[in-house]
Amino acid sequence: MAKGFNVAIDGPAGAGKSTVAKKTAEKLGFLYIDTGAMYRAITFAALAEGIDLHDGKALGKLLEKSELRLESSNEGTAVFWNGADITAAIRTNEVNSNVSLVASHREVREGMTAMQQELAKSKNAVLDGRDIGTHVLPDANVKVFLTASVEERARRRHLEQLEKGLPSDFEQLKKDIAKRDELDSTRAIAPLKQAADAQVVDTTSMGIDEVVETILDLVKEHSRQ
């Protein structure tokens, strides 16, 4: 495969994008670019510094003056903010509840998009997010839109939290996911939207390996063209 073969995986919160993207990248020997972790990182940093999350300009300045680094690790992607490892810190309920708001600002979106495009430009990479196929990499070689019911997505997130020893409220998660769907789909800048040329995969009753195999088949199909 030529350099710069990109796989874009989009979908709503809890559809299994990160897990699937990570495994797909592993199987292909591609770089995995965790765009969700990038938005979580700036959300965590803004909360830690007491920055108003409604102030797009202040958030844009925070991103400009900070160093955000992603590194491959055995557990997936390690996230560093100004040299500090914040991989675990960005997965809290507080970050979950605020990341859509932070990501809705044009200043944040533009800064992150430029970073992601730069990372993917010269590499074979798998990226997952909300607007990869429509906005970040509209020319991605393979585009996939993962979806699943709100109930199933909340169940997965609930189990994930419990496995990590974090407190979790299933009913609250359902409400949070439904609210996040609405925020992500209706924001003015790069809303969550299925690309016209994306393959839709409903993961509600599928296992992770099954979803990964479906995507690998799409990549093989594209490579044969």
Swiss-Prot record:
Question: What taxonomic classification does the UniProt entry list for its organism?
Answer: Bacteria, Bacillati, Bacillota, Bacilli, Bacillales
Which one Pfam family would you cite for this protein?
Cytidylate_kin
Question: What gene name is listed for this protein?
Answer: cmk
Species of the source: Shouchella clausii (strain KSM-K16)
Enzyme class, UniProt record, top EC level: transferase
The residues that hold ATP are 11-19
Keywords, ordered alphabetically: ATP-binding, Cytoplasm, Kinase, Nucleotide-binding, Transferase
Q: Which GO terms describe its biological process?
A: nucleobase-containing small molecule interconversion; pyrimidine nucleotide metabolic process
Query: What family does the entry list?
Result: Belongs to the cytidylate kinase family. Type 1 subfamily.
Which residue windows are transmembrane per the record?
none
Q: Give its localization.
A: Cytoplasm
Top-level taxonomic group: Bacteria
> Which GO molecular function, any one, fits this protein according to its record?
CMP kinase activity
Reaction(s) catalysed by this chain, per the record, are: CMP + ATP = CDP + ADP; dCMP + ATP = dCDP + ADP
Q: Where is the signal peptide?
A: none
Protein's recorded name: Cytidylate kinase
Pull one GO CC term from this UniProt entry.
Answer: cytosol
Protein EC: 2.7.4.25
